Amino acid sequence: MDSIDEQIAIKRKELQSLQKITSLTDGLKIQLTELNEQIKEMGMNADSVAQLMNNWDSIINNISQASLGLLQYAEGDYEIGPWKDSKKKESEQSNETGLEAQENDKNDEDNDEDEDLVPLPETMVRIRVDGNE
């Protein structure tokens, strides 16, 4: 009977060890599942960050292109006063008469209206760059 009692005690220890292993395995399974969910969330966040960085690259490129459009203008183009003064000097120097003078006056009036406007940068247009649509 001693051998049977010893075998029962050994089997009970094995059962307790297996139950501990099972509970530890279940805990490990839960932790791995949580880790998997966190990794998926990090992947989605990384995609969001990548998309955000692409958007900023697009914004910077658009700003760069708009600023390149301004390079064609000199600093004096933004000063309205010298334009008016130069037109007055030109009109004082011209001593044309007859129809030519009247035509020049009409052209000068049209030019004065155009020259009173300060040059503006190129219009920026929003263009969707992702391939979804």
Swiss-Prot record:
Range of residues in the leader sequence: none
Subcellular location: Nucleus; Cytoplasm, Cytoskeleton, Spindle; Chromosome, Centromere, Kinetochore; Chromosome
Protein name, as recorded: DASH complex subunit DAD2
Ranges of biased composition (kind: Basic and acidic residues): 82-92
Compositionally biased region (Acidic residues): 106-117
One of the GO biological process terms: cell division
Subunit-level organization: Component of the DASH complex consisting of ASK1, DAD1, DAD2, DAD3, DAD4, DAM1, DUO1, HSK3, SPC19 and SPC34, with a stoichiometry of one copy of each subunit per complex. Multiple DASH complexes oligomerize to form a ring that encircles spindle microtubules and organizes the rod-like NDC80 complexes of the outer kinetochore. DASH complex oligomerization strengthens microtubule attachments. On cytoplasmic microtubules, DASH complexes appear to form patches instead of rings.
GO cellular component, one term: mitotic spindle pole body
Role: Component of the DASH complex that connects microtubules with kinetochores and couples microtubule depolymerisation to chromosome movement; it is involved in retrieving kinetochores to the spindle poles before their re-orientation on the spindle in early mitosis and allows microtubule depolymerization to pull chromosomes apart and resist detachment during anaphase.
